[in-house]
């Protein structure tokens, strides 16, 4: 798959003129999150201290979810900002928008429409980044990656917390093999999504950044102050724990010692990786790892439904159609 994505990246660049190859045209879908103006300013504004060159947001599809207040109350304002401040052209359909861009970012705060929004992008063979949450259900997560694999289109997803400097250092081997990690983040719940998909995904993403794949089961409980606590068992006796809290913190332990993790280092590192993936066709996070991350969070919900019983990831993946 990696070779396929790399070849696709080369074909993408070859199809562009020298001028456009230096500046990819980005289309955004779903203008109802603060990530929209933040990412656009990083890409379109050379005066931004975190400016990422090589791409520009030029087109967008408004989107929005009437039944989610944080979407309905902000989509018009963010759309106005993109048009008036950055000169972004708004299209009435995703199918029309993709004709005018080289790559796409799905930013809709609501994960439920992500599959439907991804389908025309994948059909048009445009490299795609999907902001958190990748989807509104584990079943949709699996289907997005299935469609991407069949089409040979690079598709990936990540929280910006994955690219905190401390977490990346541990992932790169600063502690050797990680045997234990715990992370925290806010975990506000949106009733239309599994509990951790909405915001707890941030801390869970950090956990998987340092632990990697291999989680076999989870048990969900509560902390002493009544917050969410999820304990995951990894192959080889390794343990990873997510806890709901106000801040982004964590600790990783490995063969060479331990180190704090979890700090938020801004959006720019994530945007850098997104543009790099668009340019090369090589995704920085495998579908296998992202699927396991969402299975971890789905299993946490199933554990809650069963009163804190241990639930395997294999079980929830099978139920979701894998």
Predicted feature descriptions by range:
Residues 5, 21-124, 150, 313, ...:
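N-terminal glycine-/serine-/threonine-rich beta1-alpha1-beta2 phosphate-ribose binding loop
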Residues 92, 130, 155-157:
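Hydrophobic residues in well-ordered beta-strands that form the structural core
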Residues 105, 279-322:
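C-terminal helix-rich "cap/oligomerization" subdomain common to oxidoreductases
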Residues 125, 152, 307-308:
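Glycine-centered short loops/turns at secondary-structure junctions
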Residues 125-127, 132-133:
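Short helix/strand-capping hinge loops at secondary-structure junctions
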